[in-house]
Amino acid sequence: MPKLKANSSTLKKVLGRIARYRLNAVLSILLSAVYVGLSLYVPILAGRAIDSIIAPGSVDYAQIMLELTKIAVVAAIAALAQWLMNIINNSMTYNVVKDMRTEAFDRLMKLPLSYIDAHPYGETVSRIIADVDQFADGLLLGFSQLFTGILTIIGTLIFMLSVNAPITLAVVILTPLSLFVARFIARRTHSMFARQGEDRAEQTAFVEEMIGNQKVVQAFAHEQANEERFDEINKRLSESSLQAIFYSSITNPATRFINSLVYAAVGLTGAFAAVAGSITVGGLSAFLSYANQYTKPFNEISGVITEFQNALVCAERIFALIEEPTEEPDASDACVLDHAEGIVRANAVAFSYAADRPLIKCLDLDVKSGERMAIVGPTGCGKTTLINLLMRFYDVNAGSISVDGTDIRNITRHSLRRNYGMVLQETWLKEGTIRDNIVMGKPDATEEEIIAAAKEAHSHGFITRLPKGYDTVIGEDGGSLSQGQKQLLCITRVMLCLPPMLILDEATSSIDTRTEQHIQHAFAQLMQGRTSFIVAHRLSTIKNADMILVMKDGDIIEKGKHDELVARGGFYAALYNSQFAQ
């Protein structure tokens, strides 16, 4: 029952999106009616032609030519109607698919970071790409065959009744058995298609992970283990696909067997009727054609039901993404932070990603305007988490963080984040020109401003050596640029914006020592008068910080300037000395 309810709910959502194109749907149904009506008229014309051939006396060639001409005209009009119907069905299907993909991507852009962190990237990609494509295939099949199938059943029934009612009764009684068989099988294939979709998403996620981290895989000679893992996932996908296809493939032969029985019954009873004189040979020929056309849609509809089951499973996964709760909206009275002074305070902040595993327990922070605050500590101590809280990628569980005296939960996220310039250890560059990537935070920047920012970030030199300089097109994630060059472009992006507050999370980790010295000098100029948060593992980069926070297990265990902390001989001193040990 839960599966049936889920199917019903998903179907309603699909129909709701189809309703946006109701004019196309009406035109498709009308053209289907024209196509079916004309197709069903052909057997009558053929029957008349046959009766003209075998009628007593001479063959009526004129009548035969007339009927054949009618058949040619009717067939041509039917073909035109079918062609137009297919165009409309394709347009309607891919408009619905476009809308769903747009909805899914729009929702993805509004999801909280917690969702992105909790779900493999490949699984989400699979929902937006693979599942939508699978859904499109099933929906197109439904449009192209379901409408015409239903109309054909109704039309042939009317025509058969007009020819011979008793034989029609035999057809009507036997044929629906194929629908019961199809329904019986379809109910059992839903769970198999669902498992197939899950296995496909897992495989997509794994392949994407391996492609993105192939250097690490090869560096640690992990190829064999990954091949074994891929083979295991691939085997499960193969098994779930074969099971789904095996059971769904029973549908067509089973319905065809029933329809063959119907055809045989019509031929037998029709022959007796022809001998008895209650039907002409031409009429029997037309009836046999109708019986075949009547049973054919049952075969097609049974196939459509199977495909539609797969489409509904994919639609469920798409709608699950579309209906994910978005990031909590800004408060109705949230203010816009125009240009922050940069006074940041945290009061008794507590936060955890999972309720049973507290990370930050009671953190207090007081950063003055223009102060350079460095955050250090071992991996997993909460440094990046603190940055996430400052940017409101996550909200605190308890306590508060304020900027210029206003709780950041009462500031719009967009305006808060625009006041920060952020350079992360993980670089991100979009496909486009070098210039496009630099001006992301300031689209109206002049050429002089772009070049000045690049010179300050020491990226101008390598940019001018590229084939087309600032107009050089780079691929996704920087293409062939080195990691250091990509990092320099990200730094240039921030240099151009000149925001009042900065976050540098291992910003120079991918840059050689000589370039790092230039960058540190540029950063010193950039940070002048700007509140800055610097996350660093290389402690040599934070000697000039106004305040250093030493974190461990989510708590601040030491704070002070570099020389003070080294003189104390505590945890920071141990970290510092371990990095510079001979």
Identify the residue ranges that each predicted region occupies.
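Membrane-integrated ABC transporters
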Residues: M1-S39, I54-I71, M85-N89, T93, ...
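Hydrophobic alpha-helical segments in the permease module
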Residues: K70-Q82, T175-A182, S248-V262, L268, ...
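Cytosolic ends of transmembrane helices, especially the final helix of ABC transmembrane type-1 domains
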Residues: H222, F246, Y263, Q293-L321
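Short intracellular "coupling" helices and adjacent cytoplasmic loop segments at the cytosolic face
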Residues: M1-K5, Y94, T102-S126, A130-V132, ...
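Cytoplasmic juxtamembrane "membrane-exit" helices immediately C-terminal to transmembrane segments
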Residues: I87-S91, N95, D99, S162, ...
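Transmembrane helices of ABC transporter permease
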Residues: R20, N24-G37, Y41, R48, ...
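ABC-type nucleotide-binding domain
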Residues: D330, L337-Q582
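An intracellular "coupling" helix at the cytosolic face of ABC transporter transmembrane type-1 domains
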Residues: R20, L113-S114, A130-L139, F143, ...
